[in-house]
Structure formats: structure tokens, C-alpha cells
């Protein structure tokens, strides 16, 4: 717990159904109770939300990742924003540990939508005044918004785990980006661990199908740490792990901020060359979707610090610079 001075303040933290455990942990760290609200569904699937305490003039923070089921959690968030606006909240700050639709950030083919921008429009129109996000798939998504965005990074949390793990010697490691788009992320982790990096040249013939083509960098005899922002069906990460072992990697670890882990991900990871998968709790992970070799790290402390700094009108940049 960070402190107790916010118990009777105008700071309010609410949780929807996306990740109640994380929201509770954040509230505990801030030192206040979660705000009282009910989230119900009518028999036809419509969502009904009621805020069960006064928030007039309050700085409200709504914690809700738009993870599976994505559309349900997104609608919950939009309805809650509207409820807060109509209840005269002073500010409506949404905390989105995982931003669904972030992978649809551009027109990859003709006649495709840019759904990440559409979601940004919906959030702004509903009435949000600020968003705190964690490891957006494409950092330029911040430019889709006209409201302030505080973009937190999960890499330092992952790096601390590897530095503290007695079974891992950073001097014998190599950080691996599973594609060219993740090089900046891999470089940041490598800079913290003071290790070299490698890049996997990957080509994706169609969605959720990946093919490893080539590895750029020295792998043989080293412990490989693959880092990505999202692991979805785990096709990319497991093919990468096998390619690294084939190139002589001593061991292979994988890590990500957002464990979407859909479809065959659990089985693929458990049957892969990955010794351990390190993820954060940005997405609630049911036990039936969690591979047996998974270790979960908490982002609650990072989010709690961001909330307090926003509430106190202090700089948030110290958390991600």
C-alpha cells in the first residue's frame, strides 16, 4: 500500500468486469476501497450499469482492459464513461491495461477499417477525459486521441524479473525480437539487461499464421529471451523458440505484457521449446488458458503510481522515461 491519505479524498477507482483482481490490487496499493457500482446484463445481452455512490466533482478512474470478450468489455467501458459523465464527475480517467483492436491500426489492404481509431473516437465521444494505457501495440495509437494519453511501459517490470532470477545470468543472454516491428521493445530490454539483441525475420502469410524465415544475431550457447507485447495464438513465439533452439540456444524464455493466449496457445506453449513464459496481469488469465510453465508479474504498482500522479497533477513521465 502506498499510503492512506486518499481514503476520504475525491479520488475514486472503479472496476468493471475485465480484470477485477487487478483493479482490487491497484486500489489496495493506492490505499482506498474500490468504488461501488453494479454491472448487470439483461436477458437479451444488454448491459446495465449503476454507480452506487456519489461521484459529483470527483476524479474517477475506471480500470477496464478491453480483452476477451473484447466487444462486451468495450461496451461496459463506454457505458460506464457515460454514467460517470451524467453523474457529474470532474474528470473521467480510463485505465486500459490492454487496448483491444490495437492491431487494427492501419489499412493493410484496400477497403479495410482502422478500428483502433474508431475505438478511440468512441471513447472520446462517450466522455473520457484521459487514458492511461500500458504497452500499446502501436505507439502511434496515442495520436488517434485528442485527450491526454499516459503510455506506461511493461518492459522494466519484465527486466526486473530476469535480473532477479538466480537461474539467469544476463551476461550469457540474448534478447530476441520475434519480428522487425518489435526491435525497439527488444532494444529497451537489452539495454536494461546489458545484453545483445537478435531479430527473427518472420513472414505471415495470413492472420494467426506465422513462418520463421531467418535469425539475425548471435544465438549459439546463449540463453534466449524472446520479448513481444502480445502473445495471442502463440504461433509466432513457439516457432521462434524452436528456431532459436535449432540455432544452438542453450535455453529459451519468452515474455510479453499482454497474454491474450487464445485458441491453441496453451497447448502450443506447453509443448514448445519455451522453458518459461513470463507475462503480466494486464489481462485476466483463467487457469484453463494459462500454460503450466507460466509466471505472472503484477503491473498494479505501476498503475497505482500513475493514478496517484495524475490525481495529484504531477508528472507521469518518470514512470516510463
Curated annotation (Swiss-Prot):
For the ligand (Mg(2+) 2), the binding residues are: 179
The annotated active site, in chain numbering, is 202
Q: Where does D-ribose 5-phosphate bind?
A: 204, 228, 232-236
Please list the reactions this protein catalyses: D-ribose 5-phosphate + ATP = 5-phospho-alpha-D-ribose 1-diphosphate + AMP + H(+)
Bound cofactor: record note: Binds 2 Mg(2+) ions per subunit.
- The enzyme's main class, written as a single word, is transferase
Q: What is its EC number?
A: 2.7.6.1
Q: Which NCBIfam families match?
A: PRK01259.1, PRK02269.1, ribP_PPkin
PANTHER family with a match to the protein in the record:
RIBOSE-PHOSPHATE DIPHOSPHOKINASE FAMILY MEMBER, RIBOSE-PHOSPHATE PYROPHOSPHOKINASE 1, CHLOROPLASTIC
Q: What is this protein called?
A: Ribose-phosphate pyrophosphokinase
Amino acid at each position: 500500500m502506498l499510503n492512506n491519505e486518499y481514503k476520504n479524498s475525491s479520488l475514486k477507482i472503479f472496476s468493471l468486469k475485465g480484470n477485477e483482481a487487478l483493479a482490487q490490487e491497484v486500489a489496495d496499493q493506492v490505499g482506498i476501497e474500490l468504488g461501488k457500482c453494479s454491472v448487470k446484463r439483461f436477458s437479451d445481452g444488454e448491459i446495465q450499469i449503476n454507480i452506487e455512490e456519489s461521484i459529483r466533482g470527483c476524479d474517477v478512474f475506471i480500470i477496464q482492459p478491453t480483452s476477451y470478450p473484447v466487444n462486451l468489455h468495450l461496451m461496459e467501458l463506454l457505458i460506464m464513461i457515460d454514467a460517470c459523465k451524467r453523474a457529474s464527475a470532474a474528470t473521467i480517467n480510463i485505465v486500459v491495461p490492454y487496448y483491444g483492436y490495437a492491431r487494427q491500426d492501419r489499412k493493410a489492404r484496400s477497403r479495410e477499417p482502422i478500428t483502433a481509431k474508431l475505438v478511440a473516437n468512441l471513447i472520446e465521444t462517450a466522455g473520457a477525459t484521459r487514458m492511461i494505457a500500458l504497452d500499446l501495440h502501436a505507439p502511434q495509437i496515442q495520436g488517434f486521441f485528442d485527450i491526454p494519453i499516459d503510455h506506461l511501459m511493461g518492459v522494466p517490470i519484465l527486466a526486473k524479473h530476469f535480473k532477479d532470477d538466480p537461474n539467469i545470468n544476463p551476461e550469457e543472454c540474448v534478447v530476441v525480437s520475434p519480428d522487425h516491428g518489435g526491435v525497439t521493445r527488444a532494444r529497451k530490454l537489452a539495454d536494461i539487461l546489458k545484453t545483445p539483441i537478435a531479430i527473427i525475420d518472420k513472414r505471415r502469410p495470413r492472420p494467426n499464421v506465422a513462418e520463421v524465415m531467418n535469425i539475425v544475431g548471435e544465438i549459439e550457447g546463449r540463453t534466449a529471451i524472446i520479448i513481444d507485447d502480445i502473445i495471442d495464438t502463440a504461433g509466432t513465439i513457439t516457432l521462434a523458440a524452436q528456431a532459436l533452439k535449432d540455432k544452438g540456444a542453450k535455453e529459451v524464455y519468452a515474455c510479453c505484457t499482454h497474454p491474450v493466449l487464445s485458441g491453441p496457445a496453451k497447448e502450443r506453449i506447453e509443448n514448445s521449446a519455451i522453458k518459461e513464459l513470463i507475462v503480466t496481469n494486464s489481462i485476466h488469465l483463467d487457469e484453463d488458458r494459462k500454460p503450466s510453465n507460466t509466471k505472472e508479474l503484477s503491473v498494479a504498482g505501476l498503475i497505482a503510481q500513475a493514478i496517484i500522479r495524475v490525481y495529484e497533477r504531477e508528472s507521469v513521465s518518470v514512470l516510463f522515461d
